[in-house]
Amino acid sequence: MSLENFFDANYHVACTMQRGIHKDNEMKEMLSFSEKDSALVHSWMKDYGLFQGITSEDRKAIVDRYLSTIHVITEQHDTIDNNCIERMFTMMMTEFYNVVPRKWLSATSKLLWCSFPDNVVIYDAFVERAIMILQGITPYLADFPRIQTSPAVRNMNDIAKCAKFYINYQDMVKAILNEHQHQLDKLRIETSETYPHDIRIVDKLLWMLGNPNQAFTLNNVICKPA
């Protein structure tokens, strides 16, 4: 069995889950029109669990900082390459850290994805877990630096380390996407799938693989949590 088999068996479920996240589309639309909807951003971040352990006052401050800086951070980029992504990631995480000093890895990646939904990879610890195993059995992933646990962010100097970690992480997710692009194109046609962002479909499939509480299908067997 291989990752290709896993993708075949779980593609429809992954896409269904992604289509069900309606606020993603609202966030993308808000940004495309340069609008500022603090209630939407707050609700979206809460739904993704990005406010855990943060006071109501700090939540509002983070939303305000995001809305006041996102268009400055993301404007005037002709090519969304790694240098550009790392620069935007560092800028946004720095803005958030200045408001509430904690690791904003997941929030930064997810919010940047809303601006560049076909170019930016979101970070998730379950995906990291899946990649950690896949790297040892997948030759093209072994070409990348060994993925490690995301670094702690205890001061401003650690933000650069976190950005470097994220770039290596997203490089591997994109490598998996590139390796399976033909398969994903075929599955999209066969299932008449309308969810548009393959990069998030791959993320969801890896999330299913790395999440011990998520059921999946393989070789006509449904594997459920004990």
Label the predicted regions.
Residues A107-W113:
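Short hydrophobic alpha-helical segments that form membrane-spanning helices or hydrophobic packing faces
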